[in-house]
């Protein structure tokens, strides 16, 4: 399983034709204490870099964009009652949803962890 990152600070962990999606540790840190996550509906069809979900924190409200195209097949219901999990474990337990990817080759438009870390240094 490999992680890929977008310039908007979302990640996707790819396993076969599914991708688990969340926001990066960097994004979670920048947001501050997360107070609410608006999860997508299971069955929602999304396009790469299109709107997927939303997240609110003490500092800001932000949209979450889909790093890949496909259909949402699962959501992290834990976040409905404990959104702070995103702060505690943004790239593991704080995942947002799972997408059945319609075009797995789209990950080629994303960054590896190493490339993302280099990108962050340039911000």
Predicted feature descriptions by range:
Residues 57-60, 68, 101:
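Periplasm/extracytoplasmic soluble domains of Gram-negative envelope assemblies
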Residues 1-51, 84-123:
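Acidic, low-complexity mobile loops and tails
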Residues 72-88:
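Short, charge-rich, low-complexity interaction segments located
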Residues 66-69, 113:
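ATP/adenylate-binding site constellation spanning eukaryotic-like Ser/Thr protein kinases
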Residues 12-14, 58, 75-78:
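Residue-level recognition of beta-strand microenvironments
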Residues 49, 55-62:
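A short, glycine- and basic residue-enriched loop/turn
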Residues 18, 69-71:
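Structural motif
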């Amino acid at each position: 399983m490999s992680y890929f990152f977008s310039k908007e600070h979302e990640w996707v962990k790819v396993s076969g034709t599914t991708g688990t999606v969340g926001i990066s540790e960097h994004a979670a840190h920048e947001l501050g204490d997360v107070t609410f996550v608006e999860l997508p509906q299971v069955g929602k069809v999304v396009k790469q870099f299109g709107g997927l979900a939303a997240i609110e924190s003490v500092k800001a409200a932000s949209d979450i964009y889909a790093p890949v195209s496909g259909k949402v097949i699962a959501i992290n219901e834990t976040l409905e009652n404990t959104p702070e999990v995103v702060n505690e474990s943004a790239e593991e337990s704080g995942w947002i949803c799972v997408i059945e990817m319609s075009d797995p080759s789209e990950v080629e438009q994303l960054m590896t962890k190493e490339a993302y870390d280099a990108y962050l240094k340039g911000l």
